[in-house]
């Protein structure tokens, strides 16, 4: 009987957990739909802006632009974008692992800009310099947040605190596929091949346009990374909670089968005892 009571307690416990994971899956699915729509809307704008910047950069000497001029990299910076919360499968762990690999391969001083509690809390316990940290981005990143982050990154780059800035985030492909990646932000990459700019007349000069456009370009690149990361987080959490719900169902079936077998054995033992008692009275 004690074994049966223990099985019933386990079944109730797993059922309670299953209700929670199912609810979290539904919440994550709702948030994912909105985040996915934001990513889909932002990608064409970011791609067109990158095309415009590339065409302008091809028309000027990159060394005249402070955000594109190359210099010796004495200290590299990595902007790690993780989540503020867990229960998202391997989402945070994969980003942290990629960051550790890059820091090991760097072979020169490096610093971290941590966006999200999970990455910040992990590297606080490691011998890694965290120059800035940003948390509470929310489920729907806003452009004003990206603008502030980009402004501080540009300032650190121009002041020489960082000689190179890279974004580490997860690119969103689908609810079941998100890929961690490293993407350079600063200095802004210049086209390898000169593009034909004969069809364009710039007023004012390309140099003047770029001085205004490049900071904006950094803002949009950071904003897109935040959107991609948030959609990936929701997708990873939805998948993780779906798997947890399925695993809970399997555990409930397993415990229920064990409970039924134990109950059947108990009933059989009672019948045997009754028959044995009846035989003894004859």
UniProtKB/Swiss-Prot annotation:
One of its GO terms (cellular component) is proton-transporting ATP synthase complex. It comes from the Bacteria. It is a peripheral membrane protein. GO terms for biological process: proton motive force-driven plasma membrane ATP synthesis. InterPro entries: ATP_synth_F1_ATPase_gsu, ATP_synth_F1_gsu, ATP_synth_F1_gsu_CS. The keyword Secreted does not apply. It is found in: Cell membrane. Keywords: ATP synthesis, Cell membrane, CF(1), Hydrogen ion transport, Ion transport, Membrane, Transport. Its main location: membrane. The keyword Transport applies. F-type ATPases have 2 components, CF(1) - the catalytic core - and CF(0) - the membrane proton channel. CF(1) has five subunits: alpha(3), beta(3), gamma(1), delta(1), epsilon(1). CF(0) has three main subunits: a, b and c. In this bacterium the a and b subunits are transcribed but do not seem to be translated, thus the ATP synthase consists of the alpha, beta, gamma, delta, epsilon and c subunits. Produces ATP from ADP in the presence of a proton gradient across the membrane. The gamma chain is believed to be important in regulating ATPase activity and the flow of protons through the CF(0) complex. This is ATP synthase gamma chain. It comes from Moorella thermoacetica (strain ATCC 39073 / JCM 9320).
């Amino acid at each position: 009987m004690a074994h049966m009571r223990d099985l019933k307690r386990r079944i109730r416990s797993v059922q309670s957990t299953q209700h929670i994971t199912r609810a979290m899956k539904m919440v994550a699915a709702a948030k994912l739909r909105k985040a996915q729509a934001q990513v889909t809307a932002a990608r064409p704008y970011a791609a067109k802006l990158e095309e415009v910047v590339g065409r302008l950069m091809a028309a000027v000497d990159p060394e005249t632009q402070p955000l594109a001029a190359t210099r010796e990299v004495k200290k590299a910076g990595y902007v790690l974008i993780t989540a503020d919360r867990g229960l998202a499968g391997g989402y945070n762990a994969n980003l942290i692992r990629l960051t550790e690999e890059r820091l090991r391969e760097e072979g020169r001083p490096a610093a971290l800009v941590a966006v999200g509690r999970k990455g910040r809390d992990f590297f606080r316990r490691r011998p890694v310099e965290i120059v800035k940290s940003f948390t509470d981005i929310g489920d729907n990143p806003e452009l004003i947040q990206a603008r502030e982050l980009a402004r501080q990154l540009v300032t650190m780059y121009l002041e020489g605190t960082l000689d190179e800035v890279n974004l580490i985030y997860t690119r969103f492909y689908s609810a079941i596929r998100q890929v961690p990646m490293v993407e350079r932000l600063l200095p802004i990459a210049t086209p390898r091949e000169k593009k034909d700019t004969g069809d364009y007349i710039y007023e004012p000069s390309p140099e003047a346009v770029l001085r205004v456009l490049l900071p904006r370009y950094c803002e949009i690149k950071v904003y897109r990374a935040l959107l991609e990361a948030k959609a990936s987080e929701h997708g990873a959490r939805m998948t993780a909670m779906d798997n947890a719900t399925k695993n809970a169902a399997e555990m409930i079936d397993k415990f229920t089968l064990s409970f039924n077998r134990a109950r059947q054995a108990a009933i059989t033992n009672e019948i045997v005892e009754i028959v044995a008692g009846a035989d003894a009275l004859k």
